[in-house]
Amino acid sequence: MSRVCQVTGKKPMVGNNRSHAKNATRRRFLPNLQNHRFWLEGEKRFVKLRISTKGMRIIDKKGIEVVVAELRARGEKV
């Protein structure tokens, strides 16, 4: 399973660790992904999404029905 948020599309980024002496070593910044089940009232079933915490806030704001409709319009299987 890839580390990509299904709602926002957030992916891992790359950057540097910086020591006290300012030495740079490459590292990855991973999105805060959660596996979460949401109840779709219109379909009387749960959907499982792998979403970031930012994606959860978007679902809280817009509603799960709207977000799932947007995912399906993008061609994502939900």
Curated annotation (Swiss-Prot):
Keyword tags: Ribonucleoprotein, Ribosomal protein
UniProt GO BP: translation
Pfam families: Ribosomal_L28
A molecular function GO annotation: structural constituent of ribosome
Entries under SUPFAM superfamilies matching the protein: L28p-like
Keyword Ribonucleoprotein part of the UniProt annotation: yes
GO cellular component, one term: cytosolic large ribosomal subunit
Transmembrane segments: none
Region named Disordered: 1-21
Family: Belongs to the bacterial ribosomal protein bL28 family.
Protein name: Large ribosomal subunit protein bL28
Organism: Shewanella woodyi (strain ATCC 51908 / MS32)
Encoding gene, per UniProt annotation: rpmB
